[in-house]
Design a protein with these regions (language model features):
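Conserved SAM-binding loop and adjacent beta-strand
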Residues: 7-10, 26-47
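Conserved alpha-helix/loop element of class I SAM-dependent methyltransferases that forms part
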Residues: 36-58, 69, 73
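Class I SAM-dependent methyltransferase SAM/SAH-binding core
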Residues: 59-115, 150
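A short acidic, Gly/Pro-enriched loop at the edge of an enzyme's catalytic core
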Residues: 113-126
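A short glycine-rich, Lys/Arg-flanked "PGG" loop and its adjoining helix->strand segment in the class I
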Residues: 142-158
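Conserved Class I S-adenosyl-L-methionine
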Residues: 146-150, 170-214
Length: 261
């Protein structure tokens, strides 16, 4: 995540994000409310994978939407129903105002650790571009991250997709994803972030900007795999093949299980 001088421990708190989105530099007071910012990758970079995995008729949930252009760009490309949530009431009001004429977009202030407003199996696709990473910087990490993922699993319809765009390598993120008792089938794609590596990968190949990587049986990168760009972004496409097995005792046990993060 972009750090600047901010304390990463603030990333799980509404107060931090409210202050951030009230700043003129992010389109808040004094800035005309017109600012947009995309963590990691833009829609144009993600479009091939999104269009391949997510039909335009899907019911989509955007986690931690912030003031990203991703949802707007998806609607321009034919997506019909995107619910955007964020812990910051400030940015939600900003985005409601900006997109008041776009009927395909809905905005709600909601904490991803408790999305009980929505019923089980409400969404075909849930997109997370940096939100899990922010949760792992919160005061209640990794417990808060687990609660978020449990909610994601609950909200997904069988056959649905959770698309996680993150800086987290498989050793960290797949271990975290596997704590959820949902039958995930995970595909991993790696996108170089540094321009020099993007150019090296091009060579006219259709997959130049996104490489699908076969994971080992235990869900890790192959031992001989060489990560070309150390600043790469990882995209985990998690398919839900069955209904989550509810076990409330898991929540209390996750802190010990994930204490290595």
């Amino acid at each position: 995540m972009g750090g600047g001088n901010c304390n990463p421990k603030d990333f799980g708190a509404a107060a931090y994000w409210d202050a951030r989105y009230s700043s003129p530099s992010t389109g808040g007071k004094g800035g005309g409310g017109g600012g947009f910012f995309d963590w990691y990758r833009s829609y144009s970079a993600l479009r091939p994978l999104l269009r391949a995995c997510v039909p335009t008729s899907s019911q989509v949930l955007m986690l931690g939407c912030g003031n990203s252009l991703l949802s707007e760009d998806m609607v321009k490309d034919g997506y019909q129903n995107i619910v955007n949530i964020d812990i910051s009431s400030v940015v939600i009001e900003q985005m409601k105002e900006k997109h008041t004429d776009i009927a395909q977009l809905t905005y709600m202030q909601l904490d991803v650790r408790d999305m009980s407003f929505f019923g089980d199996g409400s969404f075909d696709c849930i997109i997370d571009k940096g939100t899990l990473d922010a949760m792992m910087c919160g005061d209640d990490a990794p417990h808060g991250a687990y609660k978020m993922l449990a909610e994601v699993a609950r909200l997904m319809r069988p056959g649905g997709i959770y698309m996680l765009i993150t800086y987290g390598a498989p050793k960290e993120r797949l271990t975290l994803l596997n704590q959820v008792r949902c039958h995930w089938e995970v595909e991993l794609y790696i996108m170089p972030a540094t321009p020099e590596y993007q150019l090296k990968w091009s060579n006219g190949a259709a997959h130049a900007m996104m490489e699908k990587v076969a994971l080992t049986v235990d869900g890790q990168l192959p031992p001989d795999y060489v990560l070309k760009d150390p600043e790469s972004h990882f995209i985990y496409v998690c398919y839900k093949s069955d209904i989550v097995t509810e076990d409330k005792s898991m929540v209390a046990g996750q802190d010990d299980a994930m204490s290595s993060f």
